[in-house]
């Protein structure tokens, strides 16, 4: 599914279209959908790994047309390592997808408001919660 990027991924502000592909119930692949770009991210379903909740800022709700949206997906960027147990997840800057309207964006959470989320957390750090 191709998404219009309404709130860019930090460091990738020039990418305006992304292709999201589900791998399984936990992992997804996000690739640039533009001819001049070869950007790819591995994403993870945070709810499969830990208790995870945050408030979406109003400006992002408006940009992504989340009011009344029936299908919203939250995913986090993962840095894959070998072995997989060394991989890290960015819980402080989730990606939000409006599946109904094919809109997406990244929100950077306030670390003071969410001190229990970090930019690089080991993928296994919350598996026993």
Swiss-Prot record:
Tell me where it mainly resides. cytoplasm
Which Cys-Cys disulphide bridges does the record give?
A: none
A Gene Ontology term for the protein's cellular component: cytoplasm
One of the GO biological process terms = bacterial-type flagellum assembly
Q: Which InterPro entries match?
A: Flagellar_assembly_factor_FliW, Flagellar_assmbl_FliW_dom_sf
Recite the UniProt keywords alphabetically: Bacterial flagellum biogenesis, Chaperone, Cytoplasm, Translation regulation
Give the subcellular location: Cytoplasm
Xref: Pfam families: FliW
**Subunit and interaction comment:** Interacts with translational regulator CsrA and flagellin(s).
Protein function: Acts as an anti-CsrA protein, binds CsrA and prevents it from repressing translation of its target genes, one of which is flagellin. Binds to flagellin and participates in the assembly of the flagellum.
What is stated as this protein's family in its record? Answer: Belongs to the FliW family.
Q: What is this protein called?
A: Flagellar assembly factor FliW 2
